[in-house]
C-alpha cells in the first residue's frame, strides 16, 4: 500500500491523447514498457558516459547507467511508500535525450545550437517521447502520462527563466507546472541518478587506472568504507576489497536518502502529492553532511577522471567530429537519410533546419557518429 503523498494511478492526469485503460497494467507500468521498447532506449546501449565506446566493453554505457538508476529508484521509492512504477519510469526515461559522447557531446551541441534555441538533454528527452518516437498510428511520441512527462521535465527541479525550445514547445501544449517541485517519485529518480553516478564513476575510474585505491582512501565516505573492509576482512584480495568498499559507499548513499526523507515526511506530514509539489524545496535529498562529502568526491572525480589527459584528448577529438558533422548537415541536408532530409527541407528557415539536424545528430550512437565522421569528414 502506498502513502497518501504518493502518486496514485487512479488520480493520474492522463495522456494527451486519451486511451482505453489497460486491464492488467497501471498507467505508469504502460509508460515504463513503452520507454523500454522505444528506439531511443535501445540506442542507449551504444552511448557512453565518459569513455568512448570503443575503448572497452567494461565501462558503463547510458543503458547500464539507466538500469542502475532505475534499480536505485525502485528501492528508495518502495522504502518510502511511493509508487515504484512511476519512479522507475522516470528513471528509465531520464537519459533518453543524451547525445553521443556523453557530456562532451552535450557541450558541443549546446554551443552549436546556441543561435537556434539551445540544447538541453532533459528537454530533448521530452522531445523524443512526445515527437520523435513514431511507432503508433494515432500520435507521434509515446503518449506518456502527465506525471511521467513532469518527472522528465523537472529532473533538476523546478524550471524557471528562459526555456529550451523543446521544453517550451511541450509545455505550451500541456502545462507541466514547471514552477513547482516534481512529485516525490520523480525526485527519487533524480537522486537515484546521483547515487548511481557517484558509485559507478569510482568503479570506472579505478578500472581505467586514472586513480588508485590509495587515492580513494583519502576521500570522505570512501576512505571510511575501505578502512571498515580492512578491519572486517584483513588481507582481502584487491578486487574484492574494492567492490566491497564501493558497495558500502553505495549503501551509505541510499540509506542516507531514505532516512532524510522519512524524517522530513514525518515532520511535514504531506497528505497528497500536490503538497509535495508545493513545498519549499525538494523532500528527497541527501543529508547536509553527506552532500558536502559527495561534493568532495565529485571534485576529485572532476580533477582526476573528467579532466584526465587521456579523457581530455578524447573530448577534443569527438568535439571536432560533432563540429564537423553538424554544419555539414545544416549546409547540405541531403547528406542525411531521406526522411531527415525531407524534414529539413520542410522546416522552412535555418532555425527549423538546425533543429532537425540536432534531432538527427543527438540521436546518433557513439559508434554511428564515428562512422559518419569517417565517411563524410575523412
UniProtKB/Swiss-Prot annotation:
Protein name: Deoxyguanosinetriphosphate triphosphohydrolase-like protein
InterPro entries, alphabetized: dGTPase, dGTPase-like, dNTPase_2, HD/PDEase_dom, HD_domain, PHydrolase_assoc_dom
HAMAP family listed in its UniProt record: dGTPase_type2
Keywords in alphabetical order: Hydrolase
Disulfide bonds: none
Signal peptide limits: none
Domain of life where this protein originates: Bacteria
Entry's family note: Belongs to the dGTPase family. Type 2 subfamily.
GO MF terms held by the record: dGTPase activity
GO biological process terms on file: dGTP catabolic process
Domain HD: 62-198
